[in-house]
Regions:
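Glycine-rich adenosine-cofactor-binding loop
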Residues: 4-24
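Conserved S-adenosyl-L-methionine
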Residues: 25-30, 130-134
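Adenosine-phosphate binding glycine-rich loop
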Residues: 4, 109-177
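Short, flexible coil/linker segments at domain boundaries that flank nucleotide/cofactor-interacting
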Residues: 1-2, 26, 107
């Protein structure tokens, strides 16, 4: 499904590093990384290029210029938001990464993955759903990170992932508007 396609990662922090490392395992033609601060973005990509295991997928720095973003988004099939924009309790809960206007024409063939897990769905994913996009929120990543940490800390392999997921859903449900 990802053969010959491009991906966009929004943000250049710690979670973006993990996302890019995962994306480098896919048969993508390019990974575009967008960040607000050019200095932070340059440092992020420099570190990644020094550390990366797979240099067959080009990493491309992308400014937040709306025209360039629009062109890149038109040819990308996966967009991952690693920023806190739109997260419940973090500024404007109705906010979307890069603003609503950029996403109003999103193609239904694009997969939108938001690492945020509350609210469910985020305003960005809700807009994507309205356009017929495949959308994924960050709950499963949260659960799997917790399971991996528990395995590592306890030495147990039989970690109750289903119970962890159910507990997370119950906890988030209690805090949903």
């Amino acid at each position: 499904q990802w053969q010959g396609t491009e991906a966009v990662v929004l943000g250049c922090g710690g979670s973006a590093r993990a996302v890019v490392a995962g994306l480098q395992q896919l048969p993508l033609t390019a990974i575009h990384v967008a960040g607000r601060r050019p200095d932070a973005l340059d440092a992020f990509l420099k570190d990644l290029r020094a550390d990366q295991c797979n240099d067959s997928v080009p990493l491309i720095a992308m400014s937040l210029d709306p025209e360039r973003l629009s062109r890149v988004l038109k040819r990308s099939k996966l967009v991952v938001n690693t920023t806190p924009v739109g997260m419940q309790g973090h500024g404007d809960d109705k906010a979307m990464p890069l603003g609503r206007d950029l996403w109003t024409g999103v193609d239904s063939s694009v997969t939108l993955y938001d690492l945020i897990y509350t609210p469910r769905p985020t305003p960005w994913l809700e807009l994507g759903q309205q356009h017929g996009c495949c959308t994924i929120d960050g709950l499963e990543m949260l659960v799997q990170q917790g399971a991996a940490a528990l395995r590592r800390w306890s030495g147990r392999e039989d970690v109750p992932v289903d119970q962890m997921r159910e507990g997370a859903l119950q906890s988030l449900g209690a805090h949903q508007p």
